[in-house]
Amino acid sequence: MQTRAIFASAEGRMLMAGLVLAGLLVVGFGIGWTLFPDSILQYAAMTGLNLLIGPGAGMSFGYASGMSHLQVVPLNMLVETLHVLVFYPLFVLSWRHLLDLPALKSFVARMHEAAASRGGMVRKFGIAGLIVFVFVPFWMTGPVVGSIIGFLIGLRPWMNLAIVLLSTYFAISLWALLLNELSAWAATFDRMAPWALLLAIVLI
């Protein structure tokens, strides 16, 4: 592992920012658990669903729990930002052999295969293709794979990061409106219906 080269690279600085942000989030949850133990469980569950399944599940849980846009949207944006700031640099640093950790080899192979198999449109249309790739969630693409494709087609690190995150934030904002409306509509039939909607999203 070449520590100096890692921290001299843009991806190394992104990784540090991601780790600091993740640490602050954990501290925030710890403080919240002390001050507001009941409320913080909802935020922790929403975060966990986002990490394990995706933002659709996390946001659906938030709206089914009665949370507002101001509670749901920023946290899911933060979690997606952490995804990119941690996993994208780990891929790049491992790809360049600046990080040589056996545990990362399978991750790098999987991410490269996913990016290679799904990145045809992005390579053809460049930045516009990357924006669409990240924006459309039903392709099971996501910002992490999108950022890796951006790297593989030669985008500069900070431009790649900006495109991926802005597209992600825009997508989350629009899907938040839709999921909130769906949750409210489902609740008109039965108070448990929003949870059935969440289950459907998880199973899909």
Locate the predicted segments by residue.
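Transmembrane alpha-helical segments of multi-pass membrane transport proteins and ion-pumping complexes
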Residues: P55, M59, E80-V92, W139, ...
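Membrane-helix boundary/interface segments in integral membrane proteins
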Residues: G120-V122, V145-G154
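Transmembrane helix boundary and interhelical junction motifs in multipass membrane proteins
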Residues: L41-M67, P137-I148
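Membrane-interfacial helix-loop-helix
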Residues: M1-Q42, L70-V136, N180-I204
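C-terminal transmembrane helix pair
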Residues: G129, F135, G142-V144, I149, ...
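Hydrophobic alpha-helical interface/terminus motif in multipass membrane transporters
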Residues: F61-G62, S94, I149, L178, ...
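Membrane-interface alpha-helices at helix entry/exit sites of multi-pass transporters
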Residues: L70-M77, L152-S167
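Alpha-helical transmembrane spans of integral membrane proteins, capturing the lipid-embedded, hydrophobic core
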Residues: A22-V26, L51, M77-T81, V164-S173
